[in-house]
Amino acid sequence: MSGPNPNKQPVELNRTSLYWGLLCIFVLAILFSSYFFN
């Protein structure tokens, strides 16, 4: 899991966390919309 470039790890982690945040917001938006529409 450890890469040869320690400088590249934080960028990858930041990008992954950003994608996870967007995904969570997207799922929450769908859940809230379906809850309100029901």
From Swiss-Prot:
Topological type in the membrane: Single-pass membrane protein
Keywords for this protein: Chloroplast, Membrane, Photosynthesis, Photosystem II, Plastid, Reaction center, Thylakoid, Transmembrane, Transmembrane helix
Primary localisation category: plastid
Residue stretches spanning the membrane: 17-37
Keyword Ion transport on entry: no
GO biological process, one term: photosynthesis
GO annotations of cellular component type: chloroplast thylakoid membrane; photosystem II reaction center
Domain of life: Eukaryota
Protein localization: Plastid, Chloroplast thylakoid membrane
Keyword Glycoprotein: no
InterPro entries listed in its UniProt record: PSII_PsbL (IPR003372), PSII_PsbL_sf (IPR037266)
A Pfam family this chain is assigned to: PsbL
Protein family: Belongs to the PsbL family.
Biological role: One of the components of the core complex of photosystem II (PSII). PSII is a light-driven water:plastoquinone oxidoreductase that uses light energy to abstract electrons from H(2)O, generating O(2) and a proton gradient subsequently used for ATP formation. It consists of a core antenna complex that captures photons, and an electron transfer chain that converts photonic excitation into a charge separation. This subunit is found at the monomer-monomer interface and is required for correct PSII assembly and/or dimerization.
Known partners and oligomeric status: PSII is composed of 1 copy each of membrane proteins PsbA, PsbB, PsbC, PsbD, PsbE, PsbF, PsbH, PsbI, PsbJ, PsbK, PsbL, PsbM, PsbT, PsbX, PsbY, PsbZ, Psb30/Ycf12, at least 3 peripheral proteins of the oxygen-evolving complex and a large number of cofactors. It forms dimeric complexes.
Name of the protein described by the UniProt record: Photosystem II reaction center protein L
Species this protein is from: Cyanidioschyzon merolae (strain NIES-3377 / 10D)
